[in-house]
Amino acid sequence: MALALAGGLATAGAAVAATSAQTAHLRHENFEQMGDAFKRVNDELGRGSPSKAKLAADAARIQKLSAQAPSWFPKGSGKEVRPKSLTLPAVWANPTDFANKMKAFQAEAAKFPRTVTAGDMEAIKAGAKSLGGACKACHADYREKKS
């Protein structure tokens, strides 16, 4: 019985580790998608006549991902399961500050699609800048600098 219980605990521990590793990988993949969407927005805004349809698609993508982002940071999903992770331990050490910054980012991400839909290009540019600033607010304290 004890051996079966120990085996069950080992299996449960492995499942949690696999889930944490999967979450860390998912977090990376989703932030890559978000970064790509930000790049497309900025590239589009740099064109002479930006496509509002392209901006709207990327704004919606950023909003959707931002709504999911808080679930990408469960305890145990840092470097301990994904050594290449850029997520700093401060995410879990300072959960209230991290959550507040995440909420501010989500609020900007929720506003941006409406700004794009309204169609005022100057407001869209200002909204993109504000959204980028809210995104970067987490980077200083919660993301390792890329080498």
Task: Name every feature range the model reports, one short phrase each.
Residues 7, 12-15:
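N-terminal signal peptide c-region/cleavage motif recognized by signal peptidases
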Residues 21-54, 60-147:
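Sequence context surrounding c-type heme c attachment/ligation sites in exported
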